[in-house]
Amino acid sequence: MEPGCNEFLPPPECPVFEPSWAEFQDPLGYIAKIRPIAEKSGICKIRPPADWQPPFAVEVDNFRFTPRIQRLNELEAQTRVKLNYLDQIAKFWEIQGSSLKIPNVERKILDLYSLSKIVIEEGGYEAICKDRRWARVAQRLHYPPGKNIGSLLRSHYERIIYPYEMFQSGANHVQCNTHPFDNEVKDKEYKPHSIPLRQSVQPSKFSSYSRRAKRLQPDPEPTEEDIEKNPELKKLQIYGPGPKMMGLGLMAKDKDKTVHKKVTCPPTVTVKDEQSGGGNVSSTLLKQHLSLEPCTKTTMQLRKNHSSAQFIDSYICQVCSRGDEDDKLLFCDGCDDNYHIFCLLPPLPEIPRGIWRCPKCILAECKQPPEAFGFEQATQEYTLQSFGEMADSFKSDYFNMPVHMVPTELLEKEFWRLVSSIEEDVTVEYGADIHYKEFGSGFPVSNSKQNLSPEEKEYATSGWNLNVMPVLAQSVLCHINADISGMKVPWLYVGMVFSAFCWHIEDHWSYSINYLHWGEPKTWYGVPSLAAEHLEEVMKMLTPELFDSQPDLLHQLVTLMNPNTLMSHGVPVVRTNQCAGEFVITFPRAYHSGFNQGYNFAEAVNFCTADWLPAGRQCIEHYRRLRRYCVFSHEELICKMAAFPETLDLNLAVAVHKEMFIMVQEERRLRKALLEKGVTEAEREAFELLPDDERQCIKCKTTCFLSALACYDCPDGLVCLSHINDLCKCSSSRQYLRYRYTLDELPTMLHKLKIRAESFDTWANKVRVALEVEDGRKRSFEELRALESEARERRFPNSELLQRLKNCLSEVEACIAQVLGLVSGQVARMDTPQLTLTELRVLLEQMGSLPCAMHQIGDVKDVLEQVEAYQDEAREALATLPSSPGLLRSLLERGQQLGVEVPEAHQLQQQVEQAQWLDEVKQALAPSAHRGSLVIMQGLLVMGAKIASSPSVDKARAELQELLTIAERWEEKAHFCLEARQKHPPATLEAIIRETENIPVHLPNIQALKEALTKAQAWIADVDEIQNGDHYPCLDDLEGLVAVGRDLPVGLEELRQLELQVLTAHSWREKASKTFLKKNSCYTLLEVLCPCADAGSDSTKRSRWMEKALGLYQCDTELLGLSAQDLRDPGSLIVAFKEGEQKEKEGILQLRRTNSAKPSPLAPSLMASSPTSICVCGQVPAGVGALQCDLCQDWFHGQCVSVPHLLTSPKPSLTSSPLLAWWEWDTKFLCPLCMRSRRPRLETILALLVALQRLPVRLPEGEALQCLTERAIGWQDRARKALASEDVTALLRHLAELRQQLQAKPRPVYTSATACDPIREGSGNNISKVQGLLENGDSVISPENMAPGKGSDLELLSSLLPQLTGPVLELPEAIRAPLEELMMEGDLLEVTLDENHSIWQLLQAGQPPDLDRIRTLLELEKFEHQGSRTRSRALERRRRQQKVDQGRNVENLVQQELQSKRARSSGIMSQVGREEEHYQEKADRENMFLTPSTDHSPSLKGNQNSLQHKDSGSSAACPSLMPWLQLSYSDEQQL
């Protein structure tokens, strides 16, 4: 490339092949197949099948190697020439005691070599100066014009290059008459070269190989010297023209400092533009521009005069031959000659100090050839891991990016830039040519010590295994016994980025194959063999300096040249990137080179095939001309293969025969020439037993085998017969022939090869005669098959003739198979495609043209005659259309049996298909036929589109299409009606159905519409029937009709009315449920309204209650023993209700008797065998705290059931003592099994009945409610009659008087100390003790002494217990029994009546007060009161904390914390709300359901009013009564 052209253009890609698995099985065969294409490029790339992935078999832990060191810019030929030139010019100045500094021009180091070459090409220095063409020189160096760079280049050339050129040409003894130039600018910055010889550099650290670092090293440090004490140094001021002596390396030191000397070597030649003011200097060129600076190591001394004459004669100037002026004589340190300083060119003004050599020594030193270039070995040994770490680190640091992200194109351009750069030194390492036997191959090897897996064994024997390929049967190298490293034995390569392999061809011009096991790509460049000599010529032309000293430079694998440079000179170059798992093949004499893109591992080996033999012979002649050593003897290889011809592959045998013939002819010619020279002596020599260095020609270095010329007098050498005149000067009689075979033995070997080679020719002649029918006789199939078997058995090559034979056999077999298909019958022909008539005739012609005698040809002729006869009949039938369909079908069946496709059969097929289709259409559309579906019609239309057109078919197809369009349109309408949200009325559906009656197609949506209309009509009829019946319809019937009506896709006006009725009925039932049912009740409304069917069975009743409480019991409609149908008859329901009342009464009486017989839990001891009561919790109630139900007489835990509250009785006042009317206290207890509902008042029930009368719907619950109301009113009438009797009225009047008396008495006081004693002591307390305490005045707390709000209602009630006396009335049995029966019947009613309460007071007053029950109730109420106070305090604390938290969180909290506080605050508020709601519900239900009658208990009304105040105040009568203590007995029951 021209200087400055740094842009690299990638060459075209080489061929890439991807063999199939079948092709991949024969490696050398596949390479031979692609050779005609790939050989034109020199290299090719092969991608194995994707599944072919051999395992990596190298022992990674033991793999250690020492890489080579590669300095990139020394690899490229032109760059190396430049560096060698710099070495020479640097040596030129170094010999004179100076060092070279390379100037910078335009901020780039000046290319001195290119400048020198261009000056020579332009005619030389004098011509350029004369023609003023320095600007052209700058232009050719690619410097920008217009900056006066030409003058600057001229200055640098004159100062640095021109003196060296003068010394090289020997013109240093001639004066140069050029004139000095004026007004020159000052030099640019210079950088020292200081380049030692490359091969003399000892390896050191990785970074020390940089040439640039050495060339750009700083100037030597000056040496401190005491100048004041050295008179010689004082005199050294200026040496002739040029700058001051800055390169002397000396500087004055301070007097106070110790003297020490720094040796600086070498000194410097400093080139400057400035001229000095010396007046006595010469005007020669070198005097103007050079100042030679002496070295400080040694000081040159003048020769002193000696008294001896012999010394005097030696002090003579070699120029003028005079010895005078000895003070001006210079002594040469190289040859000891003397020169006057004024006789030199240029003359020197004074004697220089330091080393000095004369011009003759300088010229001799510069003329020495450079040492041969080669790679150095690194000092560090690597493992794969350590080398990989180093390589990846170097690449990532160099490109400043991850190694896998560096583009290959960028890296390729950077590589060629680096190898062409003289100022940038990049050094890499390459683990190349590593012998596999030391560390193992990358492929599995069969003879390895390790046990191979089945998969590894498969790869170990694969032909693509590089250990196997060189020794395959078709390979030539398998006949070489020695393991030739790199050729027959693979070499391993471990590369890093920029590590390169230079332009080269393989030894003996053999093939090579390279496999990249893993790692980053390897970039290859290849040149075909036809351009190999052209490449050598171009490289010699561009770099003659290298090839003059090393003619075999390209064989040393140390030289690169840019592919763009080669391509610019007409050399065809291709490239490729070899990725992991890919092969690269190089062909014989194909030059190739490349470099690695990064860290990778490759393996390579050579192989030789039969087609290589001519190239191998030409290579030996080429080596002979270059005097290069051979790797093996080509003649020995040929003779060894010829000695065993039967073991050779046939292709190889043919090629060896040709080469052997040429070799024998050449040997005869050479021996004849030897005989003509007069050499007659000869002796046999087994050359193969001699070492190669003992049988090499001393002239051309060729390894001899067939013969050699030796001399008795010169036993140390021999020559090949091509150089018989170069052995020695001895007489021919003293020379003798050393031969391996005689001339008679060689033809014998050639004949054996010929037999092996001609065996194929004999076979080929037989095949040729058979295939060409040259003798007029066709061979039988068996004879042709025998020829093919012979080729397979004798391993004949896969030649064109063999392929023709195989093709012929394949055609014969195909014809026989077709004939058998024709004549073997219809069944055998069903699976095989039919032949056309044309194909039948072609088959007949083919059978006649084949070179094989086939007796089946007669059968084919018979079939052809039958087909032609059938054609005539078919044409006659088609000509007389319309023919009978049966006739057409029979003709078609006969044609199918022929096994041949006749053109007329196709027409018959069309006619039959048309007739069949038309029949199907008629049958589908016939009025009497069953209507077909849309799918059938569409199928007919699709079939009609496939058959051939005719007028009748087209008409039927159009009608069918129109019918299908109409049907699909009505189907869409029906679908819309079925799926639309807005339902259509029945009239619309009827209209759609009427329109589709005449369509002869079954329409699914229309059918669904019909069914929906039918169901709608039936639904309307059902609605009319139930609406016009004798009774209102039942709710269940209406709900069923509504559910059915909603599912119908028809708009029904009656549906909306029914939905309204059902909604109203549900609303009434929900209202009734809220009125009767407790919250979370386990009973249904109907169960509550009806009499309890199992009232007499305690166990059944209790188990059912527990099952319902657990959600396990499901009630049915048989509450009254009626079925669902009987519930629809009002009369049956009333009769069943009456019977249920009687059963309930009988059952409760039986239950009371049973439970009364059970022992009381309050008794001191219980009999183990006696039956006991069981609480709802499943345990036996015992001890204090057990309560007995007033209805069923069973016992329960007070804490397991809801109990009445005594505080719901009238409150005491400060002036009266109504609490002493104990018979009015609410001590009545009904268990949850007896009290199943809220028991609303009769007025509420009557309101529900009024609403029920307005419903046009019958509900079982409504009728049950009516029965319950009638039962309650009936009981109320009987109770009123009983209470209105004279005896009972008198008793009631007496009770009223007692109450008035109690109200007139002052309020009793109670002591705080003994207030709770009766509760704590239980039933054992003595009333007299309590009364005694009451008389003690010290412990009495008067109402005036009580602090407001601190009185305790519980303590007050407890203190009144001792004062309770009774009975207050005497009830005769005649009065008591009816009242108790009424009381029992009233308790069975799920209704609250005032008469019930009045009867309860009478019965209570007629018996002593039940102090045990009162104490139990007080204890339970006290326990509940304490729990309520605890909940109240917790609630109050939460409210306060909430306020504090809200106030604190308002200030400086972030949004997230604020939301969290709000969430917690809302949780607290919801909890508070639930607590307040809980208490409010209890209070409301207490006030709603347990308000006593004002007629009989006037005090209760005031008590009720006083309890409705939730907040206690100082003016309240009893401030300690909290609202949550007003929980009623009814509320506790529902909780």
UniProtKB/Swiss-Prot annotation:
JmjN domain sequence ranges: 14-55
Residues modified to Phosphoserine: S291, S307, S884, S1342
Major location category of this protein: nucleus
GO biological process, one term: regulation of DNA-templated transcription
Composition-biased stretches (Basic residues): 1428-1441
EC number of this enzyme: 1.14.11.67
Biased composition (Basic and acidic residues): 1473-1487
PROSITE patterns: ARID, JMJC, JMJN, ZF_PHD_1, ZF_PHD_2
Subcellular location: Nucleus
GO CC list: chromatin; nucleus
SUPFAM superfamilies registered for this protein in UniProt: ARID-like, Clavaminate synthase-like, FYVE/PHD zinc finger
Similarity comment: Belongs to the JARID1 histone demethylase family.
Quaternary structure note: Interacts withPCGF6, MSH5, ZMYND8, AR.
Domain notes: The JmjC domain is required for enzymatic activity.
Name by which UniProt lists this protein: Lysine-specific demethylase 5D
Organism: Pan troglodytes (Chimpanzee)
Upper lineage: Eukaryota, Metazoa, Chordata, Craniata, Vertebrata
Gene designation: KDM5D
